[in-house]
Amino acid sequence: MAFSLYDASVANYLQTLGAVSGFLQRGLVHFCEKNIDPDTMVEARLAPDMLPLRFQIISVAQHSRGAIEGVQSGEFRPPAAKTPYDYAGLQGLVAQTQEALSAWTPDAVNALGGRDVVFHLGDHKLPFTAEGFLMSFSLPNFYFHATTAYDILRTNGVPLGKQDFMGRMKMKKS
């Protein structure tokens, strides 16, 4: 069995998005049990110079759904840092991202291989191939922001463990 662009990207995005959805839900339950308004967590951050939970979740969506759409269009831009969301809105964004990525078939994603993609960052333009963009830029950023979101919740008392981050693994079928 060949390992495809779909396997390397969308399948991994969906696994981790499932985990992100799960740990956001665990966070909601925890905050409600502790009489903490979950919306106050939207601006929580690990350090003063890091962007908040809101931006981490927006970036998870941008570096998954947005990355595949960027490969399709040939252009990718970073997310807007100031997009307003409450906690429920962040959960909805993850659900919408999962739904949109689930609509992509392996054949459709694999057909994007070899395309040119330009990452626009201000006045800078960084040229990539689809494979280079997804593997060396999109996936590392996706995992960074998913991990940072997990860490923000964890440092705010949400009882999370490694399995909460791992999500549903792709086990061998007997």
Predicted feature descriptions by range:
Residues 2-15, 37-62, 80-90, 122-141, ...:
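Alpha-helical scaffold segments that form or flank carboxylate-/histidine-based iron centers
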Residues 17, 21-28, 65-68, 95-102, ...:
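Structural signal for well-ordered, non-membrane alpha-helices
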Residues 28-48, 112-119:
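Short secondary-structure junction/hinge motifs that connect adjacent elements
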Residues 49-77, 97-100, 105:
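Conserved alpha-helical segments that form or flank metal/cofactor-binding pockets of metalloenzymes
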Residues 66-73, 151-159:
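Short helix-capping/linker segments at secondary-structure and domain boundaries
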Residues 154-174:
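C-terminal end-helix/capping segment
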